[in-house]
């Protein structure tokens, strides 16, 4: 078993600027970074709320994952992200337990994979290994 810690909570939003302003004004959140994630067709804004980070995600393209999510379920919690030390090893353990993985992505900063909600009590879980 690989132990993990909560990395962040992901929220799907229609307007990232409005949502960043809300968390800053209401909760005193600090914007850590904001960037376009082209391979996922979204704008990501990560804010700090004390000991937890929240990723705000706005779609940049019709029919992207976030666009479809919002059309189907509305704005709200999209995923919980759990950080592990070795994603490939962890995925091997999941495979041996017949836990369904949706997809895996990698860039210079991190490797991520998503555990299908069917395998995780209706929750989309992002598993992340930070490389930097």
Regions inferred by a protein language model and the residue ranges of each:
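Conserved catalytic-core motifs of GNAT/GCN5-like acyltransferases
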Residues: 30-37, 104
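Vicinal oxygen chelate
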Residues: 1-2, 45-48, 82, 91-132
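Conserved active-site tyrosine of GNAT-family acetyltransferases
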Residues: 19-24, 94
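Short strand-coil-strand connectors
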Residues: 14, 48-50
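Short glycine/proline-centered loop/turn elements that form peptide/ligand docking sites
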Residues: 18, 35-40
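Conserved acetyl-CoA-binding loop of GNAT-fold acetyltransferases
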Residues: 25-31, 98-100
């Amino acid at each position: 078993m690989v132990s993990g810690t909560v990395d962040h909570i992901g929220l799907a939003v229609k307007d990232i600027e409005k949502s960043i302003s809300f968390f800053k004004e209401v909760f005193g959140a600090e914007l850590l970074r904001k960037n376009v994630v082209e391979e996922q067709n979204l704008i990501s804004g990560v804010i700090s709320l004390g000991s937890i980070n929240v990723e705000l995600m706005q779609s940049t393209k019709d029919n992207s994952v976030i666009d479809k999510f919002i059309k189907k379920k509305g704005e709200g919690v999209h995923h919980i992200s759990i950080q592990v030390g070795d994603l490939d090893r962890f995925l091997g353990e999941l495979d041996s337990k017949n836990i369904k993985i949706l997809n895996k992505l990698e860039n210079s900063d991190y490797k991520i994979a998503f555990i299908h909600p069917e395998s995780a009590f209706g929750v989309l879980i992002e598993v992340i290994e930070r490389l930097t």
